[in-house]
């Protein structure tokens, strides 16, 4: 079964038609993958936010009365990291129903366009939060001799392990959001 298709500048070619059930099946598969990746992103962002938000460590200094404490809320970059992950996680939870609509109606175009836009905004927010936290984590591990900032990870090893681990979940969520944007763009491109 073939049909004349206009390619460019009035040229025509014989191209096979893709049966409608196959096209709908591919769209439905993309939508199912979209929902699955959103759930994975929710897990990654909430794990990162909880891991960073519950991080603190106290070390005694000479006596029990004098102690040094390291907690995430002492550093604005870590607070921003927790807030960014929480906002992205909330967005992902709220976007699940719209993604489920795409399973039922794979041809829904405008709602997919809305998801692409907000996915890109959330990717930017998550990247900003993770980048800000990564800079501080690097300073915690390596320090900066020129600025007289010493590495604290030799003393606060549990604190540093937790903040480093929370970055892994956030960067994984960034990769998943990039894949989500590409999937949505693929689904939109197939309709034209």
Swiss-Prot record:
Its main location: membrane. Belongs to the Casparian strip membrane proteins (CASP) family. The chain crosses the membrane at residues 30-50, 80-100, 113-133, 167-187. The keyword Cell wall biogenesis/degradation applies. This is Casparian strip membrane protein 4. Residues 1-29, 101-112, 188-192 are cytoplasmic. InterPro entries: CASP/CASPL, CASP_dom, CASPL. Glycans are attached at residue 56. The keyword Cell wall biogenesis/degradation applies. One of its GO terms (cellular component) is plasma membrane. It comes from the Eukaryota. It holds the Pfam family CASP_dom. It is found in: Cell membrane. Homodimer and heterodimers. Regulates membrane-cell wall junctions and localized cell wall deposition. Required for establishment of the Casparian strip membrane domain (CSD) and the subsequent formation of Casparian strips, a cell wall modification of the root endodermis that determines an apoplastic barrier between the intraorganismal apoplasm and the extraorganismal apoplasm and prevents lateral diffusion. Residues 51-79, 134-166 are extracellular.
């Amino acid at each position: 079964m073939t049909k004349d298709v206009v390619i460019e500048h009035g040229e025509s070619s014989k191209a096979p038609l893709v049966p409608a059930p196959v096209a709908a099946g591919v769209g439905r598969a993309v939508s199912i993958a979209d929902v699955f990746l959103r759930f994975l992103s929710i897990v990654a962002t909430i794990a990162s936010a909880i891991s960073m938000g519950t991080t603190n460590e106290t070390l005694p200094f000479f006596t029990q009365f004098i102690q040094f404490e390291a907690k995430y809320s002492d550093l604005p970059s870590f607070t921003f990291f927790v807030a960014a992950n929480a906002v992205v996680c909330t967005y992902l939870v709220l976007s699940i129903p719209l993604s489920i609509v795409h399973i039922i109606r794979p041809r829904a175009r405008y709602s997919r366009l809305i998801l692409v836009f907000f996915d890109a905004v959330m990717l930017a927010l998550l990247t900003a939060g993770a980048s800000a936290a990564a800079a501080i984590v690097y300073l915690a591990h390596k320090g900066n001799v020129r600025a007289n900032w010493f590495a604290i990870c030799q003393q606060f090893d549990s604190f540093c392990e937790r903040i480093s681990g929370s970055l892994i979940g956030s960067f994984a969520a960034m990769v998943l959001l990039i894949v989500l944007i590409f999937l949505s763009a693929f689904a939109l491109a197939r309709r034209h």
